[in-house]
Amino acid sequence: MRGVNVLKIILRYIPIAILFLVLAACATAPRQEICPSGTQDLPGCPPLNAIDDAEINEIYEKRTWYPAKDIDEDLIKLGKQAEIPVQHARTKFLGPSPHDAIDSLAVKLWMIENAEHTIDFTYDIFKTDLIGYAMLGAMCEAVWRGVDVRVTIDSAGSISGGTHSALRALGTCADNAGFMRNSEGQLTTKKARVQVVVFNAVSKPSNPNRRSHDKLLVKDGSFEEKSAVITGGRNI
């Protein structure tokens, strides 16, 4: 019964994934929306009731991806110097059994479905099978409701046919993205994005052993009362 319920959830997101793949194949250059200062009741612009929220603005900027050559700060040094607060949290371990694997998948989809502000999704191996498309569909739907999404996938782990094009297609979901909400649930002027990074592309000269083995999904990471993390040995 557990597997049947999870399968129903997976199948619900497959049409969304197929839709954005088709739209991406047909898309021309994206139309740039011109939004006058403030909020305007225009397509692609913040709604009239949106607010300019300082906390969301800061989170938005910190989450923006920049090429390494454009970053002046030593991020490793900053990480070593960072004072990371110890927070109390509940932890649940999922084992290696087939039932645990189904639970792990269900938890991942639940986290994406229930994210209110941000999603960070980073995995070593990502394949465009039934599960992969379900994850992409769920993230696409999240962007539509105003959740800012970041995806990092290792190049070697995602080298299977169609994976990179599917990840690029995920970016088209941002064409109809909603606007982010602050901690009080109010709409802000920041439009949700999809940022996809393929780590250490195999098409570029590099150390073949310099791979990312991260397996991490973070929901609402900057909002303590809403945040959740799943990590471990399972890829997608």
Tell what function each PLM region has:
Residues 26-27, 31-118, 125-236:
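HKD-type phospholipase D/PLD-like phosphodiesterase module
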Residues 4-14:
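Bacterial N-terminal signal peptides that target proteins for export
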